[in-house]
């Protein structure tokens, strides 16, 4: 092979049409080579892989964190409990008001205030559970982004060719 990239083959002159150097997007040791010299490869074929144990573990960790966040965001236990509490509080307050209407001052003002406070507290618990759900959904979105980033980093450990050709 001549220094200008040409090779002489018994009566024929072969010239390289495209000579490409393909760089890895991450630093590291090559752990796997997917071709042999002289082999034809298609565009976007994976030529080699860099050692990626740490990147793979980051993807697994991010997947677990994402799954956990999705589970938290989809849980409605807190909201259901708050709604049940509100239903009970409203029923108790309504019974006390009915009793006071039927028999004047049968329920003390202090008890009526306590029942109203309990009802208001239950309403606030519903608002709080809704806010918690919104925050949990944002957390799930954040974890999804972290998973995507970890997967992108892992993908950068694969060295692919932009063109078809012979290696």
Stretch-by-stretch model annotation:
Residues 2-6:
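Hydrophobic alpha-helix/coiled-coil detector that fires on Leu/Ile/Phe-packed helical surfaces
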Residues 1, 36-112, 127-150:
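Long, charged alpha-helical "stalk" segments
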Residues 17-20, 124-131, 152:
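A glycine-/polar-enriched beta->alpha junction
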Residues 29, 120, 138-141:
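General helical structural elements
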Residues 154-157:
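Long, amphipathic, non-transmembrane alpha-helical coiled-coil-like segments
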Residues 115-123:
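Short amphipathic alpha-helical coiled-coil/interface segments
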Residues 9-11, 15-37, 42-47, 161-167:
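Short, solvent-exposed beta-edge and connector elements
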């Amino acid at each position: 092979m001549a220094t200008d990239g040409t090779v002489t083959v018994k009566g024929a002159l072969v010239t390289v049409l495209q000579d490409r150097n393909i760089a890895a997007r991450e630093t590291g040791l090559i752990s796997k080579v997917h071709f042999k010299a002289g082999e034809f490869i298609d565009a976007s074929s994976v030529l080699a892989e860099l050692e990626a144990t740490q990147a793979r573990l980051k993807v697994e960790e991010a997947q677990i964190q994402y799954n956990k966040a999705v589970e938290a965001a989809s849980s409605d236990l807190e909201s259901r409990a708050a709604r049940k509490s509100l239903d009970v509080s409203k029923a108790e307050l309504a019974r006390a008001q009915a009793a006071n209407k039927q028999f004047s001052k049968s329920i003390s003002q202090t008890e009526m205030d306590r029942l109203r406070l309990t009802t208001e507290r239950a309403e606030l618990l519903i608002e709080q559970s809704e806010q918690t759900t919104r925050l949990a959904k944002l957390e799930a979105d954040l974890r999804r982004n972290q998973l995507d980033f970890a997967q992108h980093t892992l993908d950068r450990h694969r060295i692919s060719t932009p063109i078809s050709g012979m290696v």
